[in-house]
């Protein structure tokens, strides 16, 4: 995740799209997880599949990761530059039905960055998807306050 000013740089539409400056694209997905299968894996395998240490969240060295680790394939590195999104996961559960998962939301300056990340996850066999199933997915455009004002005034 970007931090500080990078959050704005990667999460908010800039001057390149003047009609929508300060807006954002948001992509939301609901995933259900097979936690029994995940927990059956040794911690070392879980770390290889995610690409990070389980308890410290420190990124593994490239040679320690599975080639289809989540943090390897869920990237957009066009033109040798890492393109980022602002992301967040929130857990949910329906204990009576044994359902557990996360809601993912990502904010992006450019929708195609999120699209590329998702395409890579599904075409490069992201190891996380062996244990997580996407249930829903939605794309939203979030207008800036100026754009909302223009709509309210009948200018757009």
Regions found by a protein language model. Give the residues of each.
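Long, histidine/aromatic-enriched segments associated with O2/redox biology
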Residues: 1-156
């Amino acid at each position: 995740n970007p931090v500080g000013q990078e959050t704005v740089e990667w999460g908010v539409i800039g001057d390149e799209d003047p009609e929508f400056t300060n807006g954002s694209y948001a992509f939301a997905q609901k995933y259900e997880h097979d936690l029994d299968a995940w927990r059956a894996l040794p911690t070392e395998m879980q770390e290889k599949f995610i690409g990070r240490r389980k308890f410290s969240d420190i990124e593994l060295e490239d040679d320690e990761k599975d080639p289809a680790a989540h943090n390897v394939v869920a990237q957009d590195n066009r033109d040798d530059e890492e393109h980022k999104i602002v992301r967040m996961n929130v857990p949910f559960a329906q204990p009576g039905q044994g359902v557990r998962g996360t809601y993912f939301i990502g904010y992006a300056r450019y929708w195609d960055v999120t699209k590329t990340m998702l395409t890579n996850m599904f075409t490069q066999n992201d190891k996380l998807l062996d244990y997580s199933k996407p249930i829903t997915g939605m794309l939203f455009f979030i207008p800036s306050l100026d754009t909302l004002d223009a709509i309210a005034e009948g200018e757009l």
